[in-house]
Amino acid sequence: MKLLIMCEGPNELKIINILLENQKLKFSSDDLLGLVPYHARQIKSSAAVKAALNLYPDEVHVLRIGDGQNEKLEIPSAYKDKITLVEKYCTKPELEMLLIISENLAAEYEKVKSKTKPKTFAKANIRCGRRRYDNSTAFYEEYFGPDCEKLV
C-alpha cells in the first residue's frame, strides 16, 4: 500500500514537503506513491498522478490537502479498485493561520477575525526578515524551511 498525497495548492505542497524533509510526519517519502506529494485537485487532470497510479500495482490511500471542503474527489473507473481510501484534510480557515499562530498573533487576530481574513491579517502583520508576507510559495519556504518546528 502506498499513500497518494494530493495538495490543492502550491503552498500546501510546500508545507508538506518541508514536513517530509524534516521527518515530522508519521510516514516518509518511501511510503508515497512516486516518492513525492503532488500538486493536484483531481486525478483526471494530473498526468503525473495518473502515471504514478499506472506504474504502481497495489492499493493506494489518497490524502487530499486543501481549503475546498465540498469538492469531491472523482476517481476514474480505471482506479476504482486500486484506491481503497480517500481522506480529506482541510486547511480552513486559511493556511495563513499557521503563520499567525507561529508569530503568537492568534489573540490579536481573534479581535479582528469577524472583518479580516487571515490572508489580509498576515499580509499586514507577518514578516520573515525584511520580507513582508506575500502569499508566495517562496515565503513559506523562507519562513518554515529553516525552522520547521514552527509547524508542529
Regions found by a protein language model. Name each.
Residues 2, 13-34, 46-152:
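C-terminal accessory helical subdomains adjacent to catalytic cores in phosphodiester-
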Residues 7-9:
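Extended, compositionally biased accessory segments flanking or bridging domains
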